[in-house]
Amino acid sequence: MVLSPADKTNVKAAWDKVGGHAGDYGAEALERMFLSFPTTKTYFPHFDLSHGSAQVKGHGKKVGDALGNAVAHMDDLPGALSALSDLHAYKLRVDPVNFKLLSHCLLVTLACHHPGDFTPAVHASLDKFLASVSTVLVSKYR
């Protein structure tokens, strides 16, 4: 999915507002995903999935950091996310549908924390961006 210049501007502006909360938002999105889509828990049998657990917070930070890297490299998502794509495809073998589920939970989390900034245009841009990230992450599955 091609991001327009307006989409890139919207994504960067939204991510700037996330600021130092990327890890917290990542953890919150993971918690939402585990509660809303319980089958996603199967990839984390060794985690304490309770609210506020250190393991969920730690993985949330990884999610937030990866998205921050993707925002910084929007013009080369395949290059920026290649190692992460390899990890999820070859080692972790995550079902590709889970990226869509997490993307949805991230959108909900961002909308909850920044309701005034979450306009239809920003929502659409973030959705396109997260779909692009998901596409790159599943590209090694073929």
From Swiss-Prot:
| Entry-annotated residues carrying N6-acetyllysine | 17
What is the role of this chain? Involved in oxygen transport from the lung to the various peripheral tissues.
Where, per the database record, does this protein carry Phosphotyrosine?
A: 25
Species for this entry: Antrozous pallidus
Which residues get modified to Phosphoserine?
4, 36, 50, 103, 125, 132, 139
Which sites bind O2? 59
The entry assigns this protein to a family as follows:
Belongs to the globin family.
Provide the binding site for heme b. Answer: 88
UniProt key word Ubl conjugation: no
Report the gene name: HBA
| Annotated positions of the N6-succinyllysine modification | 8, 12, 17, 41
Q: Domain of life, per the record?
A: Eukaryota
Task: State what protein this is by name.
Answer: Hemoglobin subunit alpha
Q: Which UniProt keywords apply?
A: Acetylation, Heme, Iron, Metal-binding, Oxygen transport, Phosphoprotein, Transport
Q: Which residues carry this modification: Phosphothreonine?
A: 9, 109, 135
The entry's cellular-component GO terms read: blood microparticle; haptoglobin-hemoglobin complex; hemoglobin complex
InterPro entries for the chain: Globin, Globin-like_sf, Globin/Proto, Hemoglobin_a-typ, Hemoglobin_oxygen_transport, Hemoglobin_pi
Q: Let me know which tissues express this protein, per UniProt.
A: Red blood cells.
Q: Name one GO molecular function term.
A: oxygen binding
Write out the GO biological process terms.
Answer: hydrogen peroxide catabolic process
Describe its assembly: Heterotetramer of two alpha chains and two beta chains.
Q: Which Pfam families match?
A: Globin
- Annotated Globin domain residues: 2-142
Keyword field contains Acetylation: yes
